[in-house]
Amino acid sequence: MNIQALLSEKVRQAMIAAGAPADCEPQVRQSAKVQFGDYQANGMMAVAKKLGMAPRQLAEQVLTHLDLNGIASKVEIAGPGFINIFLDPAFLAEHVQQALASDRLGVATPEKQTIVVDYSAPNVAKEMHVGHLRSTIIGDAAVRTLEFLGHKVIRANHVGDWGTQFGMLIAWLEKQQQENAGEMELADLEGFYRDAKKHYDEDEEFAERARNYVVKLQSGDEYFREMWRKLVDITMTQNQITYDRLNVTLTRDDVMGESLYNPMLPGIVADLKAKGLAVESEGASVVFLDEFKNKEGEPMGVIIQKKDGGYLYTTTDIACAKYRYETLHADRVLYYIDSRQHQHLMQAWAIVRKAGYVPESVPLEHHMFGMMLGKDGKPFKTRAGGTVKLADLLDEALERARRLVAEKNPDMPADELEKLANAVGIGAVKYADLSKNRTTDYIFDWDNMLAFEGNTAPYMQYAYTRVLSVFRKAEINEEQLAAAPVIIREDREAQLAARLLQFEETLTVVAREGTPHVMCAYLYDLAGLFSGFYEHCPILSAESEEVRNSRLKLAQLTAKTLKLGLDTLGIETVERM
């Protein structure tokens, strides 16, 4: 259940009854401090100003119309006109029971939408590197959350599978008489790529052949298409291994590469010209956008077709947005692409809107993210200054986690140890990223991410096992426990219950904003509240069976919420650590 939404509507109705306009914003927020209650309505200031009255006076009038009977035990006005709302323990107890009775922990499903999520997007014939990590795991957390909320999610892996480099690669493979590319490892392909590029730059005859091969590939010649398909196939087979290791839900079926949009490009250029949006400028087709100015303060020109007839990324992105609306019937499109691409996307979307390809009612959202930095504050690199391969990073995570868990569990069987090390190591890498606000750069630090203290995956995984251990000791009868009532008398019980019931609100924010760090912060806070509750409210040695069972149910909902929350992040939980 979404308590924030329930209270917002109640306060809004009371504000309207007190004379506020129908579109007033109650601004109900979770309270930052316990003394301010569970929720606080902060909307009186802005509305009172419009009405020409003191905020506190408006708050007093709102209170006369505010009916929170059965929801709040106390409502008070604080400061200049904040309304503090303290939830009723009986209300909390009832909704904890309801959450436990539901597989979804009482989380409602909003109106179903078709949402396209563009994420990961590696390049063909290159191995995935750390630069692909953020898009891949942040995008996947958004996908998992949206799917849990009941939306139809279309994963779009916008793979770089087209361009002049393919003529170069095919020419080099042919020269090396290695047309049987299917048996090659991607590491070989990377070497081939470097060698091919060297020849392309230094050997004009080879470069000319490569350019001819691009033309043949683009014209649909079957031999060259087959070679191209091999290159794509090898790459995506290798990438799938990485996705599976990362516990990411992408599959081969989600690949929607740049090549998909090629047939659309001539028609788009012709249509933009026919609509008067694109004009000829120095032999190229250009759209001038008033929204973007060049250094001289003139409308910026965005090239959609070069003088030689070639198309640009912008043209592909226009076609891509059009396809996602017209063919995939998207109600909303999310792009997990780094912040450096922001202006490029804004320009493409400005053209998309002007051309009427995607209506304003369908949001195109750039969920941009910052960079992953080393401890020196510079982009994360190998010691030699090279790009860190994602597979190498995951190997190191596994090795470090293996040492860590072996130290803590010297007698654990090898197969169990390996499984635990994988959950901890991969979880640590993912959680370290997901727990940071995606819009900022973050420092990659092995020691911090593998620590058992603080907002880390090992701490969260351990917190979950700690709650489970209570049940192992309790030797509970599931049926008896299900029938037992929840009774909330202690402050720490109430605080834990209220936080547990804010799970849906947290999911809603992640779904709306694409910010998994909000879920990480919620789960970390929840684990801390459980720790305080466990310390001050004895469970197994409670004063009565009634209190014991009630507290066990709070522990049970905590375990379920931690597991489900971590699952929406793609973080594996374990039963023992």
UniProtKB/Swiss-Prot annotation:
It is found in: Cytoplasm. Its EC number is 6.1.1.19. Keywords: Aminoacyl-tRNA synthetase, ATP-binding, Cytoplasm, Ligase, Nucleotide-binding, Protein biosynthesis. InterPro entries: aa-tRNA-synth_I_CS, Arg-tRNA-ligase, Arg-tRNA-synth_N, Arg-tRNA-synth_N_sf, ArgRS_core, DALR_anticod-bd, Rossmann-like_a/b/a_fold, tRNAsynth_Ia_anticodon-bd. The keyword Membrane does not apply. It holds the Pfam family tRNA-synt_1d. It catalyses: tRNA(Arg) + L-arginine + ATP = L-arginyl-tRNA(Arg) + AMP + diphosphate. A motif ('HIGH' region) lies at residues 122-132. The keyword NADP does not apply. GO terms for biological process: arginyl-tRNA aminoacylation. One of its GO terms (molecular function) is ATP binding. GO terms for cellular component: cytoplasm. Monomer. NCBIfam families: argS. Belongs to the class-I aminoacyl-tRNA synthetase family. This is Arginine--tRNA ligase. It comes from Escherichia coli O127:H6 (strain E2348/69 / EPEC). The lineage of its organism: Bacteria, Pseudomonadati, Pseudomonadota, Gammaproteobacteria, Enterobacterales.
